[in-house]
Amino acid sequence: KVKYIPCSLDLNRFKLKTSEWPKKIALGWTGTFSSKHYLDSIRDVLYEVDKYLDIKIILITNFDYSLEGLDYEVIRWRESSEISDLHKIDIGLYPLIQTNWALGKGGLKALQYMAAGIPAIATNFGTVKDFITHEKNGFLVDSTKQWVNAIKMVAENTKLRNNIIINARNTVETNYSVSSNEKKYL
């Protein structure tokens, strides 16, 4: 008998972000060089959003990256600072390119954002459709225009943003935490 066990996070590690919503919004992406092409796929989104909102881009990664003309920071990923680095992000971005390879991705980064109290915006493709319900616990987007609109909605609508944060954390606690899945392992 085969049983699917989803990505599972230790919520004792992934504490909720508690800081106030800033005037300058930090859009964040986390990933390695092997997933750089996903970040490249939303470059235009970042430049477009910068026309409407006061933003900073936070990239948590293992490689150098340039976003000339934008306010951005590259933070080297380290396990010891992973959570505190994630807490520098206000909106988490999880872009994918629609390929067979991407279908196999488990959506871990989006789940990490959700667990940490960071609203997640993801490409409407693959596994994320199993755990993100659009405008309830995150956003699923298909185009540059939808990326931009979702970022603006999260930034400008406090009630929606707060509901997404609460619902996202509940989703992870209920279905994607170690404690919710431990019986499946044993």
Language-model segment annotations:
Residues 1-15:
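Donor nucleotide-sugar binding/catalytic pocket of nucleotide-sugar-dependent glycosyltransferases
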Residues 10-14, 20-88:
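Conserved catalytic-core segment of nucleotide-activated headgroup transferases in glycan assembly
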Residues 87-88, 115, 133:
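Flexible glycine/serine/alanine-rich "lid" or loop that lines and gates the nucleotide-sugar donor pocket
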Residues 94, 112-115, 119-122:
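Short hydrophobic beta-strand element within catalytic cores of glycosyltransferases
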Residues 94-103:
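Short Ser/Thr-rich beta->loop micro-motif in glycosyltransferases that lines
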Residues 104, 124-135, 139-140:
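Short acidic/histidine- and often glycine-rich active-site loop of Leloir-type glycosyltransferases
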Residues 134-145, 153-159:
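Conserved acidic donor-binding segment of nucleotide-sugar-dependent glycosyltransferases
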Residues 153, 160-175, 181-184:
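A short, well-ordered alpha-helix in the C-terminal region of glycosyltransferases
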